[in-house]
Amino acid sequence: MYEHNFNNVIKKLDMAGHTLQMDGNVTGIKMAQRALKECRPGGKALIFQRKIPIILNLFASETRIEVAMKGPVSKFNPDKELHDLQFMSPDKYKDINLSDLPILPHHEGDVSGSINTGCVISMADGIHNCGMYRIQPLSDSEAIIHCYPESGLACQLEKGEDIPVTVAVGTSFQLILTAVSKLPADADELKIADSITAKGLKYIKTDRYPVPYGTQIIIHGVVSATEKRTEGPFLIHTGEYSKPEDYPLLKIESVKMIENGYYHALVTGTDYCESRTLLEAAEKFTSGLRAE
């Protein structure tokens, strides 16, 4: 059994008493309120049962991160020599629509729900780039991608060309960690995620770019270099709402979901929460890089 499979990580956490099964027949705002209350020492990851289960607080504690990483983040540094990606045959996926996903608003002032754990993979000069950007759905065929100035994706868009992307939602923590970390512009994040995985991270081939084996949702699309739409507002980590601003249009080409998959989302807040835990883990990780 491949232990870094997203579902297997959840099973390990469940067996260790780190998860709670919840009634999913509530609003996203109620889910978020419960998730924020659970962000405390001894708090659990919450799995809200519905047609597509929603999992919150998955990586909202160092203990759960260590289960996913098989050790503390601080001990993992990329190898000086990165290796070619290793591939496995994929599990079964089915085609779905973006609107089939339970993308729910978490706060009263949110303009809508958003995909906020998506690892957005692109390629430049033969190198895989990966960043985590908020994605606001507009329809089954269009969304807005919050690629903030100076982000890897924004820098690629400066060339004036549309950018094909693959978005991995519900994926390996190693890729999530590299996606939220500040790494050199020429870093191949897929290879770095592999290098910090015990026995290596396994990938699957898709219609575009590779994603980790066991990724729950795979979205293919194209980020427009010319078309923008107004994104937001959303509650951000400062406790304030983002100002509505124009960001690039993401044209959706396909959405696939693994059989019996989960929808992984995180809740943003001013107190201790999953987004803060991820940023702290990224800081420890990049501190290790600087120390090499």
Task: Give residue spans per PLM region.
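Non-catalytic, beta-rich accessory domains that mediate macromolecular interactions or localization
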Residues: 1-292
